[in-house]
UniProtKB/Swiss-Prot annotation:
GO molecular function, one term: glutamate-tRNA ligase activity
Reactions catalysed, as given in the entry: tRNA(Glu) + L-glutamate + ATP = L-glutamyl-tRNA(Glu) + AMP + diphosphate
Listed name of the protein: Glutamate--tRNA ligase
Taxonomic lineage of the native organism: Bacteria, Bacillati, Bacillota, Bacilli, Lactobacillales
Provenance organism: Streptococcus pneumoniae (strain Hungary19A-6)
One biological process term in Gene Ontology: glutamyl-tRNA aminoacylation
The encoding gene: gltX
Nucleotide-binding among keywords: yes
Similarity comment: family membership: Belongs to the class-I aminoacyl-tRNA synthetase family. Glutamate--tRNA ligase type 1 subfamily.
First-listed, main subcellular location of the protein, grouped into a coarse class: cytoplasm
Keywords linked to the UniProt accession: Aminoacyl-tRNA synthetase, ATP-binding, Cytoplasm, Ligase, Nucleotide-binding, Protein biosynthesis
General function of this protein: Catalyzes the attachment of glutamate to tRNA(Glu) in a two-step reaction: glutamate is first activated by ATP to form Glu-AMP and then transferred to the acceptor end of tRNA(Glu).
Length: 486
């Protein structure tokens, strides 16, 4: 590429890090790292009404958890928060006012509402109509004096070139253009409180920080022509733009909504449940991009090497919770036991299950976990007297030979001394029951598994029985025999 790559992630500190914003950050990160460019973070905190205490820290903390790093941010650079840059915005507001490219607007909110209602009744497209239209200089001066005397604080509006065409070649969407006459008239670049509006401030920031490429969600497409107007008014070259497609719910086919309860949507939720950050990073990287081929498990280094902006999808990205859970399970299965056990400790401790067998339990159930917090429901059988059964499990336990199998295996366990009760000696006892009773296959193994664990599927049965313990296993079998005899 001919110019230095400088990209940014610019969140508003208005809450937790959402999966959509995390994707924006991640794609900018991958793009910068792939091309040897600069990835920076800027905080857009001019919307004071939506400002959340600790929102900035939460954003940065969760990005770090995902495994991202950055080259510039408010932590290392001054004036990387918009609230620290008000003097800079004012400088360019004053310049545009002096050049006649912007003007002070004294229209009240009540007048704007009334005009919108009139336009609606008349079937007109809603738009702001310049309040000075048709006024002479004397009338304009008198109008301003009257409004200021009434204590009305003005906004500042950009004078829109309604005959202008604002177009760009989008990195994802291809050629896009808007007519200046279709964006709603002259728009506010500075609010009454002196703060700039988003579409003005972001241009000043991106130019000042020499941003080369703006990669963001396609909900920003409608903002782009307004931003191009500011670039034009100030005589600056605009960066390249790329607008990623929406993330949709794979079950509903609609835009992912914070009201969708079937998906976890905030990075904090994944942290709390014990997902591995590498798994979440991998999953998000494939939301609207793929490197080609059938492989889906990639390390961060592989994703950086493979990332190609030309493969950003033009179709909506489906958020599939089941796919994420499959991917997470793959990462947990392949992680070392020490890592997963350390992650599991807080869950085990809170449940009162951090016993001397805890690490063995984690090792036993690690291949089944989609998130580490699942260690609690997975190990319920070790801390209860009688496991609850599903209808399918109850049906198995109504089999004619079930009592025979359970009585025979209980007798084998009772006959084992403590020093003989080890994992490798348990399977031979099950085979001995087969030899004595002539019962084999599912009719042999399934009743024992369900009686001991309350599950039709799970880890190796001898491992489960050993960790449950001889006495507890016998107790579970006795409880099951009582249950099926009712």
């Amino acid at each position: 590429m001919s110019k230095d790559i400088r990209v940014r992630y610019a969140p508003s500190p208005t809450g937790l890090l959402h999966i959509g914003n995390a994707r924006t950050a991640l794609f900018n990160y991958l793009y910068a790292r792939h091309h040897g460019g600069t990835f920076l973070i800027r905080i857009e905190d001019t919307d004071r009404k939506r400002h959340v205490e600790d929102g900035e820290r939460s954003q940065l903390e969760n990005l770090r958890w995902l495994g991202m790093d950055w080259d510039e941010s408010p932590e290392s650079h001054e004036n990387y928060r918009q609230s620290e840059r008000l003097d800079l915005y004012q400088k360019y507001i004053d310049q545009l006012l002096a050049e006649g490219k912007a003007y002070k607007s004294y229209v009240t909110e009540e007048e704007l509402v009334a005009e919108r209602e009139r336009q609606e009744v008349a079937g007109e497209t809603p738009r702001y109509i310049n309040e000075y239209l048709g006024m002479s200089e004397e009338e304009k001066a008198a109008y301003i004096a009257e409004r200021e005397a009434a204590g009305i604080i003005p906004t500042v509006r950009l004078a829109v070139n309604e005959s202008g065409i604002y177009k760009w070649h989008d990195m994802v969407k291809g050629d896009i253009e808007f007519e200046g006459g279709n964006i709603g008239g002259d728009w506010i670049i500075q609010k009454k409180d002196g703060y700039p509006t988003y579409n003005f401030a972001v241009v000043i920031d991106d130019h000042d920080m020499q941003i080369s490429h703006v990669i963001r969600g396609d909900d920003h497409i409608a903002n782009t022509p307004k931003q191009l107007m500011v670039y034009e008014a100030l005589g600056w070259e605009a960066p390249e733009f790329g607008h990623m497609t929406l993330i949709i719910n794979s079950e509903t086919g609609k835009k992912l909504s914070k009201r969708d309860t079937n998906t976890l949507q905030f990075i904090e939720d994944y942290r709390k449940k014990g997902y591995l950050p590498e798994a979440v990073f991998n999953f998000i990287a494939l939301l609207g991009w793929n490197p080609g081929g059938e492989d889906e498990i990639f390390s961060r280094e592989e994703l950086i090497k493979l990332f190609d902006e030309n493969r950003l999808s033009k179709s909506p990205a489906a958020f599939d919770q089941k796919k994420l859970d499959w991917m997470s399970n793959d990462y947990i299965k392949n992680a070392d036991l020490e890592t997963i056990f350390e992650m599991a400790k807080p869950f085990l401790e809170e449940a009162g299950r951090l016993t001397d067998k805890a690490e063995k339990l984690v090792e036993l159930y690690k291949p089944q976990m989609k998130s580490v917090d699942e260690i609690i429901p997975l190990t319920d059988l070790f801390f209860s007297d009688f496991p609850e059964l599903t209808e399918a499990e109850r049906e198995v336990m109504t089999g004619e030979t079930v009592p025979t199998v359970l009585e025979a295996f209980k007798a084998k366990l009772e006959a084992m001394t403590d020093d003989k009760f080890v994992t490798e000696n348990i399977f031979p006892q099950i085979k001995a029951v087969q030899k004595e009773t002539g019962i084999k296959g599912k009719n042999l193994f399934m009743p024992i598994r369900i009686a001991v664990s309350g599950e039709m599927h799970g880890p190796e049965l001898p491992d489960t029985i050993f960790l449950l313990g001889r006495e507890k296993s016998i107790q579970h079998i006795e409880n099951m025999l009582k249950e099926i005899s009712k």
